[in-house]
Amino acid sequence: MDYDAITALRDRHPAWRLLRAGNASLVLSFLGEFFVEANRGACPAGQVAEALDNHLYALSAGSGESRYPKEPRAYLEDWAATDAGYLRRFYPPGDDEVHYEVTPAFEKAYAWVVNLQSRSFVGTESRLHTVVALLRQIVHGTEVQPDVRLAELRRRRAELEAEIAAVEAGDIAVLDPTAVRDRYQQLSTTARELLSDFREVEENFRLLDRAARERIAAWEGSKGGLLEELVGSRSEITGSDQGRSFQAFYDFLLSEQRQAELAELIAKVSALDVLEADPRIRRIHHDWSEAADRAQRTVRQISEQLRRFLDDQVWLENRRVLDLVRAVESIALEVRDAPPTFGLEVDEPGIEIALPFERPLYQPPTEVAVESHVSAATEEVNADLLFAQTYIDQARLADTIRAVLPEDSSALLSDVVAVHPIEQGAAEIVGYLALNEDDLAIDVDDTEETVLEYPDPADPDITKRARLPKVTVRRR
């Protein structure tokens, strides 16, 4: 970084302003303990003010003098002001109370101050192993040659087999206390840095939303172009390295198996006698889950707020259209009694308008290939079935019923058939059911059945049965 860039950071960056502030000790001690160390997200102003009041009381009681005379809420408003930027002050959706949460700039300043403390032990071995492991992952993860990958996998297998053989022989190599403390120190540092990174991810999403709102407010093009640009911006964030990394981390936390493994490993590490376990590390996996959920909730809230913002813009545009329509109607009412004189009269009743684009484009006719060759029939077809059709004379059936039934009477179809047996098979039964005469009615009762017997027209020696609902014939 050059001189001008460093000067700009000193003048504008909230973290640098905080370190130069006169009450930096109060800001760092309270906000660091309340938000960072306790892994709190956005909290109501009343809760934060009450905690700050207790903190100020403890400071005054310890020193015997009141060094901070202002009210707690006044301090919170000062820290959330634009020229400070240590706190974010906002109203959550559906809540009328102000909420506060620390900004990523504050977390950077707080982490820098925490790292200023002298450490009794500075481990380097574990970080060296981490660097080497990352280099191996990058090199072998980008290798496309199968023989090189196979050689690396065989090398790992040989190391595992040698380690298994040593354990089976009773030679178990364990980490010494120094190596354990070295790795635990790196674990603690990395775990805390992850929590700070989540707040920065949230802030990046908010900056994206703010830029989107600014584009909407100043947009002069079509709605389609605006939506395309907004969706493109969202896709860029989701598909960026940061977006993909965050989504992969969140998917990892959602796995119950990985959560159980993390909890088991943390419990075993915290139980080691050679360590002074950090209390926050015992539940760090829960803190990660809460921080990731906050980031996801922020994305959902931003999407919902952006949708409502677009709806409001559409409503305003529709309102403008309605205002213009009403203005035209008002002018029409004003000139209704005194219409303006025509400046030009045309004898034609109307003007025929022919727009060029109304004419369809030329489409060549579709050529259909017709094969006129017809193959001669070679199969012998038995045409007897065509001449063996049975004709049912429904007039004869109606006369049969009239001969059996007097007027205003009824009888079962089975009784009619008993008097005049069926001669033409099932087709004759269907003919009875299909009668449509003015003085005859056919009623079918599906709740009961009847069986009609009739000789087979093709072979009178064979008797067939037809099962059908109960049929009543009425004559009017």
Curated annotation (Swiss-Prot):
Protein name in the entry: Uncharacterized protein MSMEG_1279/MSMEI_1241
Keywords noted in UniProt: Coiled coil
Superkingdom in the source lineage: Bacteria
Pfam families: DUF3375
Gene induction: Constitutively expressed in all growth phases, part of the MSMEG_1276-phd-doc-MSMEG_1279 operon.
Organism name: Mycolicibacterium smegmatis (strain ATCC 700084 / mc(2)155) (Mycobacterium smegmatis)
Coiled coil: 147-204
Matching InterPro entries: DUF3375
